[in-house]
């Protein structure tokens, strides 16, 4: 099993290390612990992972600043600016996409042409990734015109990702706070 106990997509996610060890013992299996030393997804940088842990408040680390020479990390004031940047980066080799937490209803699933992620204060609207693309949406040529949700991008890889932070994630008094009640009621992972 490959486990990151700091990540969870649904309330019902199972597989904590202690639970797997218990089940293995009950089945008479031997457990061998190994640690992933680096990840290709983040240039093999443990510093990037430590920075994420620090900035998201998972655990304090010595990496409170991201090295700008290793990563292109930008914060935009507008989702329109994010979309423009992602479209420009994608024009090179089809390896840039946008994602968001499941905070907006998936209206286009039933109503062709309906927009899903709508932020009227920014003049921004896009559709969720299309149902017809299923698990391959991120590689489809036209998917740069869609937004993937956390359920459809988990484990997939691109060179550039634009993240729309929805109302389920806020910063209060310097702390990152999750508000799961602000996610779409269509999100079955909340049940």
Question: What is each PLM-predicted segment?
Answer:
Residues 26-191:
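Core RecA-like ATPase module of SF1/SF2 helicases and allied nucleic-acid translocases
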